[in-house]
Swiss-Prot record:
Source species: Pasteurella multocida (strain Pm70)
Protein known as: Amino-acid acetyltransferase
Chief place where the protein resides: cytoplasm
Annotated HAMAP family: N_acetyl_glu_synth
Class of this enzyme: transferase
Length: 440
């Protein structure tokens, strides 16, 4: 990374460093993640998160390692409703795998980053289990479910700056040990601790669409469809499916954001948390982007967005004072507090016409659908105001508007006031669209 790129990244990440400090993250580390060569870098990045003041609870699974041990001992796993039935013989091997992973993860976290204090990693009986029991005549034996979580003790450890490490084996009140689904532990911990985020890993960079492109944002209902598809493809135990189960459940109970990233790509965790767009899939209760009317406090960001386009001659120059007077006319797209697009609606009520003006989209988002989203928002607002015709003046984007139903027009077609102030030097093309107002 060149020095200029480093400076840019560092400046961009600063708001997120401040935003995340003091918050609680629950991080899911399944057996596949732990087994991958990049895991040492993931651990280093987790240590870095801790050094930035983020409270961390690590929940690890061991399915990959357990399966290896069972195969070595020629023991075949039996499942019912996608849950492994754990007998006494299997449980001893499960304990062996989980115990080794617990020690290995704690040891790696204890390796200090240069010039950083020693990290305190704490494990304990924070989760109490109970047997699943018998279902459809099938005895789950030593496969269990959560009975209780000692959130007070976990919070005490987090408050004293320790990382809490929890595996999939938990004791019961009778002293027995039970094998629990680690995704259930992760989701319930996130819910009980009111975590800011739930984070998981998979082989791919999040959830992929039919073109193998990462889906950056998912709503719970969309996530449920992807989970159903994975189950239909017999991938119930995949990293993606287990994350989605945990994230959907967590979202139902108020965890606003969960993230799925690649365990194979170095730095994914940091890129997801400290850049505006991340690199993986975010499951949230609502989209990270909102469309809203601008306020006076948005003016500095609006100026920053439109200035480059003004300098290129694409937009007419507007002063801060003009923006202040016209701020109520602006619709913006807000992404995590950053304005990435804007457009103004200037109404000429007597002629029932309005101009869509000052259309600007941040360079990082110009090859996306933000322009269409803005246009739809402006059209909707214009209809609400009783506008029958929407027009634009443009020097560069004639075809874009024509593709969306605008027709080339003449100066004479403009409202009287706009016609009087038409800039003949710019020679802007005029396009008009008739709005179809629904009559109730």
């Amino acid at each position: 990374m060149r020095s200029t790129e480093l400076v840019h990244w560092f400046r961009q990440s600063t708001p997120y460093v401040n935003m995340h400090r003091g918050k609680t993250f629950v991080i899911m580390l399944d057996g596949d993640t732990i087994a991958c060569p990049n895991f040492v870098n993931i651990i280093n990045d987790i240590s870095l998160l801790h050094s930035l003041g983020i409270k961390l609870v690590l929940v690890f699974g061991a399915r990959y390692q357990i399966n290896e041990l069972l195969q070595q001992h020629q023991i075949e796993s039996v499942y019912h409703k996608n849950i492994r039935i754990t007998d006494l013989t299997s449980l001893e091997l499960v304990k062996q795998a989980v115990g080794k992973l617990n020690y290995d993860i704690a040891s790696r976290l204890s390796l200090r980053l240069p010039h950083s204090p020693l990290i305190d990693v704490v494990s304990g009986n924070f989760v109490l289990a109970q047997p699943i029991g018998v279902d459809d005549g099938i005895d789950y034996q030593l496969s269990g479910k959560i009975r209780r979580i000692n959130t007070e003790s976990i919070q005490q450890q987090l408050d004293r700056d320790a990382i809490v490490l929890i595996g999939p084996i938990a004791p019961s009140v009778t002293g027995e040990s039970f094998n629990l689904p680690f995704e259930e532990i992760a989701s319930q911990l996130a819910i009980k601790l009111k975590a800011e985020k739930l984070i998981g890993f998979s082989a791919t960079q999040g959830i992929l669409d039919e073109n193998n492109q990462t889906i950056s944002d998912l709503l719970p209902q969309d996530a449920e469809l992807y989970l159903a598809k994975l189950i239909q493809q017999n991938q119930y135990h995949s990293s993606q499916a287990r994350f989605l189960q945990a994230a959907i459940e967590a979202c139902r109970f108020g965890i606003k954001r969960s993230h799925l990233i690649s365990y194979e790509e170095d730095g994914s965790l940091l890129q997801e948390l400290f850049t505006r767009d991340g690199v993986g899939t975010q499951l949230s209760m609502e989209h990270s982007e909102t469309i809203r009317l601008a306020t006076v406090s948005d003016i500095p960001a609006l100026l920053e967005l439109i200035r480059p386009l003004e300098q290129q001659g694409i937009l007419v120059k507007r002063s801060r004072e003009q923006l202040e007077m016209e701020i109520n006319q602006y619709t913006i797209i807000d992404r995590d507090g950053v304005i990435i697009a804007c457009a103004a609606l200037n109404c000429y009520a007597d002629e029932k016409m309005a101009e869509m003006a000052c259309v600007a989209v941040h360079p990082d988002y110009r090859n996306s659908s933000r322009g269409d989203i803005l246009l739809e928002a402006i059209q909707k607002r214009a209809k609400q105001l009783g506008i029958e015709k929407l027009f634009v003046l443009t020097t560069r984007t004639v075809h874009w508007f024509q593709e969306r139903g605008f027709q080339l027009a003449e100066i004479a077609d403009l409202p009287d006031k706009k016609r009087q102030h038409y800039n003949y030097q710019r020679r802007s093309k005029i396009l008009i669209q008739a709005l179809q107002n629904k009559k109730g």
